[in-house]
Amino acid sequence: MSNFLPDSSCYELLTIIGRGFEDLMVVNLARYKPSGEYVTVRRVNLEACTNEMVTFLQGELHVSKLFNHPNIVPYKATFIADNELWVVTSFMAYGSAKDLICTHFMDGMSELAIAYILQGVLKALDYIHHMGYVHRSVKASHILISVDGKVYLSGLRSNLSMINHGQRLKVVHDFPKYSIKVLPWLSPEVLQQNLQGYDAKSDIYSIGITACELANGHVPFKDMPSTQMLLEKLNGTVPCLLDTTTIPADELTMKTSRSSANYGLGESTAVSNVRAANGESTLHPYLRTFSSCFHNFVGQCLQRNPDFRPSAGALLNHPFFKQIKRRASEALPELLRPVTPITNFEGTRPQDPSGILGWCQTWSSWMWMTGNSRKTKTALGSGGAFWTL
């Protein structure tokens, strides 16, 4: 953890950029006064948390202290201030991959950009799996990109250890808490909750779903009822990349992104009739062809039988990544154009909800989870010292 002081007076809270955790959490852009560096501060009202919520937060902080990898979001400081848990992390100037496809790449990113992003995520997953954990929440909103184009995996709150009494378990059975918003990304074996359990290969399925999300502009199974989604996955329905090889040619002449939604098992967030500045319809947004290596990569990740899915380490050697010739920090900023990272904070006032980041009021990257009860007042058994990691 970086040498940032665990003292709230060292941080000037600026624009609110997100809320979550049953509205018990507020996320601020902040300035670290000793260095002038801009950071993100997540503040959780502990007095309103249930004991279960506190235990959940303790688990995340334990993992954040344990992990140390260049593709996992580092926690700069964690501490208690006036009955609030403060978590300080770097400010990610490009936001999350979900932010990018919602605001700029509504019909999907380029294949090369996706390759760079997924390579970073797989490196993080390979590390997490070797540490004996399952991530259980791989999705675009948990993939963050820094100002210099580096890729980071977040969402550590959902991590589950597969080590019990010093022994690595073959499978686990725990269903992720507060997981309603992550259901489309979860593997069939996690969803079915049977005695067979699941292991780290469940994260590989989530990689396949995330690849489709980044390529198609929307997550497969979007807005599908939970029961139907479960049946589709258990019956072996496999989402795909939307391009000229998966969409009938006659539909590609319709010049809409909505016509092909069923093939991706979801509905695109793009406007139905895409029009140019002169009012004329443009070409169909999915009139493109992804490489056979990309299709194969997704197919391997989405195998119904987890035993047939490659490990994260094996996937890093997949031919899909041979197109990568440079470091992500060199290539991604170019591939994400015309998007530019947020680096100008002039005019951003303390606690100003309409400041420079007003456009990202509900950044999905920071929407932690939803729960059901917050009536029980928590008792911090180990005191504030536990939280100062």
From Swiss-Prot:
Q: What does this protein do?
A: Pseudokinase which, in complex with CAB39/MO25 (CAB39/MO25alpha or CAB39L/MO25beta), binds to and activates STK11/LKB1. Adopts a closed conformation typical of active protein kinases and binds STK11/LKB1 as a pseudosubstrate, promoting conformational change of STK11/LKB1 in an active conformation.
GO terms (molecular function) for this protein are: ATP binding; protein kinase activator activity; protein kinase activity; protein serine/threonine kinase activator activity
Q: Which InterPro entries match?
A: Kinase-like_dom_sf (IPR011009), Prot_kinase_dom (IPR000719), STRAD_A/B-like (IPR047173)
Q: Which residues form the signal peptide?
A: none
Instruction: Name the protein family.
Output: Belongs to the protein kinase superfamily. STE Ser/Thr protein kinase family. STE20 subfamily.
Please report the organism this UniProt entry assigns to the protein: Gallus gallus
GO biological process terms on file: activation of protein kinase activity; protein export from nucleus
Superkingdom, according to UniProt?
Answer: Eukaryota
Tissues expressing this chain: Expressed in brain, hypothalamus, heart and skeletal muscle.
As for subcellular location, the record says: Nucleus; Cytoplasm
Q: Does the keyword Phosphoprotein apply?
A: yes
Instruction: Please give the record's comment on domains.
Output: The protein kinase domain is predicted to be catalytically inactive.
* This protein's UniProt keywords: Cell cycle, Cytoplasm, Nucleus, Phosphoprotein
Q: What is this protein called?
A: STE20-related kinase adapter protein alpha
Can you cite an annotated GO cellular component? cytoplasm
Transmembrane stretches, start-end? none
Primary site of residence: nucleus
Chain ranges of the Protein kinase domain: 11-321
